[in-house]
Design a protein with these regions (language model features):
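Gly/Pro-enriched, hydrophobic low-complexity segments
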Residues: 130-198
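N-terminal mature ectodomain segment of secretory-pathway/periplasmic proteins
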Residues: 15-89, 119-127, 132-136, 140-148, ...
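Short, well-ordered beta-strand elements
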Residues: 163, 283-291
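Short, solvent-exposed recognition patches
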Residues: 198-282, 295
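Short, low-complexity, Pro/Ser/Thr/Gly-rich segments in the mature regions of secreted, periplasmic
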Residues: 294-309
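N-terminal signal peptide c-region/cleavage motif recognized by signal peptidases
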Residues: 9-11
């Protein structure tokens, strides 16, 4: 059953509103510039998590903390462009990054000007979430090949109060929902200790070997572009895996190809937003992994073209 509020109705003929894109861009700016604290729940097919997220800007750099409120204490801290992870039973570590991936939905950090040629931003109206009046906006791909979002944005602060990720049938895959929040400079003051804390060392991630591949997809959804490629030797298989990573600024997927083995098999699996599609063709195992509907993943896989080795 869809989690979309039954009280929210909108016309199927609603047209894209240019001001909706501007509002979404304001949400992007507010989320990264204000001092605030959110208590929220994250709901998906695996269950419900209760979390707290704090964000401030100190000395012109972002400082943020994500804390799991139930069960074992899991904490993620951002200072500048370094993200540190603390979890029971694991050695703490730090990675480079622009924001805490598991905090606010990725949509919040998106450049909506870049998305505008490929997505419609549709104003749905206004409703209340967390006792706040919110603008409601749908973010829908124009070509119908991707998932969509509905955003409930506080009209005053422009912070997201609720974000639903929907599949192509309108079923809710994930929901971010704020329970309570605070916006004031005291949030920044309470985070001063994090600004001075000793964080774990930066973990170096080995880069894959750059290479020219003899394959490429002949079709990908409009707006996606290749952002990296690599060849890696994985411990679980004997042959190297060649990978291309694509993104449209909102969703991403990778195309991974290795020589087929006796253990290779075809499969199509979707868990929440993530689809894994594996096919065998021309003695190669083609695996699409990413935030795509299964039908789109299959179309990309079927479009892979191999050229003769030089």
């Amino acid at each position: 059953m869809s989690l979309v509020a039954g009280s929210l109705f909108f016309s199927a003929n609603a047209s894209a509103d240019l001001s909706s894109g501007a509002l979404l861009q304001q949400m992007n700016m507010a989320s990264q510039s204000l001092n605030y604290e959110l208590a929220f729940v994250s709901i998906n097919k695996q269950g419900v998590e209760s979390l707290r997220y704090r964000h401030a800007r100190l000395d012109k750099q972002p400082l943020a903390q994500l804390l799991q409120m139930d069960g074992p204490r899991r904490e993620v801290v951002q200072r500048g462009n370094e993200i540190s992870y603390f979890e029971p039973g694991l050695e703490p570590f730090t990675l480079n990054g622009d924001y805490i991936v598991d905090s606010l939905p990725a949509l919040v950090y998106t450049d909506f000007k870049r998305l505008s040629p490929y997505y419609d931003f549709i104003s749905v109206g206004r409703t209340r979430i967390a006792d706040r009046l919110c603008e409601v906006i749908r973010v829908v791909a124009k070509d119908g090949t991707r998932y969509s979002y509905i955003v409930w944005m506080d009209t005053e602060t422009k912070l997201p109060m609720r974000v639903d990720l929907l599949d192509r049938d309108g079923e809710t895959l994930e929901q971010f929902r704020v329970i309570s929040f605070t916006v004031n400079n005291q949030v920044g003051s309470s985070m001063q200790s994090l600004a001075k804390a000793n964080l774990p060392p930066l973990l170096s991630v080995p880069a894959g070997d750059a290479a020219n591949f003899n394959w490429a997809p002949s079709w990908i959804p409009q707006g996606f572009s290749e952002i990296s490629s690599s060849r890696r030797q994985l411990p679980t298989i004997e042959t190297a895996v060649e990978s291309r990573l694509y993104s449209d600024g909102l969703f991403s997927f990778s195309v991974n190809i290795n020589r087929a083995t006796a253990n290779s098999s075809e499969q199509m699996l979707r868990t929440g937003r993530r689809t894994v599609s594996s096919t065998i063709r021309d003695n190669a195992e083609i695996t699409i992994v990413g935030e795509l509907p299964p039908q789109t993943a299959k179309r990309i896989s079927d479009s892979i073209k191999f050229r003769a080795a030089q």
